């Protein structure tokens, strides 16, 4: 009657395995991805090889992607801080206009070129200050050679208004313009510098980087030329400190020792990229010599050693740290003295001291420790309005000494060494709008007119 039905199947796979066969040499090496030179195929090849045909919707999506990629090669697009002209050329509109107490209102036109894999990088800047009535320019070029881009040659020619002990541009320069306009606070000091520099760096192996450099610069004092401001028209900007006018020719040597292990991606087109597999700290050693024998006004030597690292353990322990020391001998001009890495109020993102005044401590010997830990969402994770933010705690310590000879040599004496070891602690809220960070820092000693300091910066990534 069909109430009972029996069925069954038998399946057998017979394979021929060879156990413990020796693996050919070169299969497991430091290259984790290797694209063969003839691996690039056109759409006709893949159309003939497809086992499952794409749907019309998928084909349309692929065509749209190809159109978008081709469009990017020639279109003009605007991003948050830059204009893009095609794939390789950019310009920064935030630097087209800026203001400071030396140049007054200033214009700066700039263009940047980056080739694929940044093998070639070129930058051009031309500007003019309406208060100091001086033109400025800076042309730089660098090229990376060899298959893994481990040999780099760089050169720059410049005539510019240089910021003392800090480099800024883009968002930082725009931010300084706003604080000058509305709070009469020009955060940095300036001097004129005209000359050129070039450098060569080479990695014989991933763990060692060698470098040599040469700088020639004629450096002169820049004077304050304006007191204009929107909100405080009856007040005055602080004086721009004089420097030791000098002609400097400086030879530099540097060495990086990096114990980390690396793997590589071979793109098959003559380019190789490195990927770090470990997170050990690395050591940077530097030496600078400015001899009178080759025309320098002042003769001095500077030595530098810095250990840096970043270690992620878990969501609560994400450490970044720097330990370093600098030592100088000879007659060091004011503009070349050692200093602590600190943000003078330019919304910068570098790791360093938070509660210091700009150029407060200078000297010919310095020692510093910077440590911070990102606790992630641990503090604010359950707070509705704050759960997207990170909490960062930091501690910084440092000591700067200045010899009597170099203090007397300095053209400006509005600075000092630290009284013992300077200490500060604090915390910050990061990932504000994904890119900003607010810090609250407290001095534990060397207290002058303030113990607490709040600053607004770009986040560290």
Where are these regions (language model features)?
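Short loop/turn motifs that connect adjacent beta-strands in outer-membrane beta-barrel proteins
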Residues: 26, 78-81, 85-88, 114-121, ...
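Residues that define the transmembrane beta-barrel architecture of outer-membrane proteins
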Residues: 103-107, 133-137, 192-196, 245-251, ...
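Gly/Pro-enriched, hydrophobic low-complexity segments
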Residues: 1-29
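Transmembrane beta-barrel strands of outer-membrane/channel proteins
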Residues: 113, 122-128, 153-161, 212-218, ...
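Residues on the lipid-exposed face of transmembrane beta-strands in outer-membrane beta-barrel proteins
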Residues: 107-113, 139-143, 155, 196-202, ...
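Outer membrane beta-barrel transmembrane domains
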Residues: 227, 232-247, 334-432
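C-terminal outer-membrane beta-barrel translocator/porin domains of Gram-negative envelope proteins
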Residues: 153-170, 179-189, 270, 275-383
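Transmembrane beta-strand segments that form the barrel wall of outer-membrane beta-barrel proteins
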Residues: 88-99, 110, 115-141, 153-155, ...
